[in-house]
Amino acid sequence: MNKKVILMILDGWGKSPDPKVSAIDNANVPFINSLYKNYPSAQLRTDGLNVGLPEGQMGNSEVGHMNLGAGRIVYQDLAKINLAVAHKTLAKEQVLIDAFTYAKENNKKVHFLGLVSDGGVHSHTSHLRGLIDASQEYGLDQVYVHAFTDGRDVDPKSGAKYIHDLQDYIKDTPVKIASIVGRYYAMDRDKRWERVKLAYDLVVNGVGTPSTNPVSSVLESYEKDVTDEFIEPVVIVDENAKPLATIVEGDVVIFFNFRTDRGRELTEALSQHDFHEQNMHKLNLYYVTLTNYDETYQNVKVVYNKDNITETLGEVLEKAGKKQIRIAETEKYPHVTFFFSGGREIPFEGESRILRNSPKVATYDLQPEMSAYELADALVPELNKGEVDFVCLNFANGDMVGHTGIMEAAIKACEAVDACAKKVIDAALANDYTTIVIADHGNCETMINPDGSPNTAHTTNPVPIILVDKQLKNIQDGVLGDIAPTILELMGVQQPNAMTCHSLL
């Protein structure tokens, strides 16, 4: 075979066992429904060991795109760090030993920053507990947690329990919670520096609502209808109404999120650049991140450095002299580039990139179509030219609007994706492209929890694979790692030995 191929990723578009709770099943999506009738389809697993995560762990976009491009199961940081915590080897990591030794010898505070939930997408509470244990093995007595509440990868009002459990865990130690703020502010990834500033001012300047009781502060936020993701800065104070701890020059900061994308902006403000407009100034800190957030950072130490994955789909196509396009809106642009390329920022020879900005709205339920139409309109002329051999396209809507937990908006998101998928696939068929329609993980097919509350998290449901091709009549079930070998078979390019998964044709 010598086909030209489009990989169309419908982000967050899973297969629901219960149509009542599914935005997809409640939406008017005639085109995607017609694909199931007219072309072969099967399902893919995107969770747990199928993608190199711990058993039962829901997949996510970073992991999904990494597996898709790699053509193999990529063992993730979450699984690696879980093992280190379980086997109590975290305290033996040299980077942590050096940080704790520096703190002890120089009488400096240690600040743990990160998302306090067991969502397992950006962080895990077990990792924080492991770090706390390690700090106590070193006899450190000035240890503070700056807790970012989640409400997005876990239920919107689960934060109070996570904070309660953390307090319970540290009650017989000198470790204290120093501040609380929602991830909306502390973990932005869309250059909304005005949000990041609130988190920066909280941890550096102690600016926030003063409190002596972390759990009560979270519960008070719920009473005002502000859920975990959006909790406004809370600074924990002592009996003299002074902040327990802020980050000052020379302190140790350990950012314990293992996923890289949402730790970058706060890290940049604290340690890399001055942002004069926001009055955020970098501090001279002993700064440690659990994984490598960015190769270019100066003076940031990394506990677990990733091995870059070689012989990804992009690299194999480069060697075969093929032209490729990576196309997405801002929210998923790193996924179709950096993650799909196995942790590589630089484009391959023959790779071009099309980016459209995600809409500047507070939350995507306000504009559920996002920038899907702009993506379709940008890609169709390229398909009509017929010069590109492979396209990796991501429609973000099902995931990003699914995360809001608002069913009506998610339905509109699905309908926008349906219309845009039609534009692209009509052009694909007219220009002799084969399209593989898949998702990287589930989300918008489960918008409601069994108790009736909104579900904002990813799921472990299987996702579809549809093979839109004029000749081929079969496709098998598989995992995300099987997609790159499938694409190579369609394109008539030899699969490298490093790709250990197999074609689903």
From Swiss-Prot:
Catalytic activity: (2R)-2-phosphoglycerate = (2R)-3-phosphoglycerate
EC numbers: 5.4.2.12
Superkingdom, natural source: Bacteria
Biological processes per GO annotation: glucose catabolic process; glycolytic process
Residues binding Mn(2+) 2, per UniProt: D11, S61, D440, H441
EC class of the enzyme, as a word: isomerase
Keywords: Glycolysis, Isomerase, Manganese, Metal-binding
Cofactor(s) of this protein: Mn(2+)
Pathway the protein acts in: Carbohydrate degradation; glycolysis; pyruvate from D-glyceraldehyde 3-phosphate: step 3/5
Note describing how the cofactor binds: Binds 2 manganese ions per subunit.
GO cellular component labels: cytosol
Active site: S61
Pfam families per record: iPGM_N, Metalloenzyme
Binding, Mn(2+) 1: D399, H403, H458
InterPro entries from the UniProt entry: Alkaline_phosphatase_core_sf, BPG-indep_PGM_N, Metalloenzyme, PGAM_B_sf, Pgm_bpd_ind
Residues at which substrate binds: H122, R152, D153, R183, R189, R259, T260, D261, R262, K332
Single GO MF descriptor: phosphoglycerate mutase activity
Description of how the protein assembles with itself and partners: Monomer.
NCBIfam families from the UniProt entry: pgm_bpd_ind
HAMAP family reported for this sequence: GpmI
Family: Belongs to the BPG-independent phosphoglycerate mutase family.
Function per UniProt: Catalyzes the interconversion of 2-phosphoglycerate and 3-phosphoglycerate.
Protein name listed in UniProt: 2,3-bisphosphoglycerate-independent phosphoglycerate mutase
Organism of this sequence: Flavobacterium johnsoniae (strain ATCC 17061 / DSM 2064 / JCM 8514 / BCRC 14874 / CCUG 350202 / NBRC 14942 / NCIMB 11054 / UW101)
Gene behind this protein: gpmI
